[in-house]
Amino acid sequence: MEQTLPTLTDCPHCNSKLKTGGLIGTNKLVSKKFIPIINEFSGLHHEQYCEKCAQKLYETSKGKFFIERNALDKTIESIIDCVPVISLQSPHKWEYDVLDMVTGQSTTGTGVFSEFKSSFTDFFGMQSGAYNSKISNGENLCLTQLRLKCIQLGGNAVIGADIDYAEVGGDKGMLMVCMTGTAVKIHNTEVLGQERIQSLEKLTKAVERRQYLRSIDVTNNAYVTVEAS
């Protein structure tokens, strides 16, 4: 025989009386989608909150969420290059486990190949610099994708990296840059040097925390909403 859970009469956090109707307003339990972010950033561990206390807790927690997320993004961006990405298939003295293939793709804006139609002088002047800049940006984006995917797999290096270029979009002159590689986990990390080891440890923690924050539902609501009846 199933047991019926007792109906709450007071808020588990602030002990305010719960009211579903009446002449002086209501005070209902808020939707459970707000609970994870409140608990994560307030230090509280209640399963439910009421309208009276949840709004301020939610606003404060949401602010802390975005501050930490932005700080993590800056940290990851500043040290992501510490993940080695090399074309060698079996680097000398590396002892590692193969994890999985990782890939990265980037498509530039329009007008890339139109630069080839310019004069010979222009091609070897300013326009060649703009063209190379677009390619370089695409390569850097692909490298970042490979490195992030490697860390997310629990690895610390990418070997056997390969890069390809292709024209896409017909006459729109768009360039796709594609990279592939194999994510590995190096066991004898001393081959990378102490500074890189420390950066990899910091990067791994930042990526793990960033992934966890992504699992928390942060709504666009400015105000908390109640549970549906």
Model feature map: region roles:
Residues 22-30, 61-73:
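Short cysteine/histidine-rich zinc-coordinating motifs and their immediately flanking basic loops
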Residues 171-211, 222-223:
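C-terminal edge-of-domain segments
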Residues 66-126:
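Histone-fold modules and their flanking histone-like tails across chromatin and transcription assemblies
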Residues 17-24, 44-45, 56-60:
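Short, non-ligating residues that shape and space the ligands of small metal-coordination modules
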Residues 11-14, 50-53:
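Short cysteine-rich clusters marking metal-coordination/redox-active sites
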Residues 25-47:
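Short linker/helix segments within small regulatory modules
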Residues 1-8, 16, 38-45:
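Short, flexible, mixed-charge glycine/proline-rich loop motifs
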Residues 102-109, 115-164:
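Short, well-ordered alpha-helical segments
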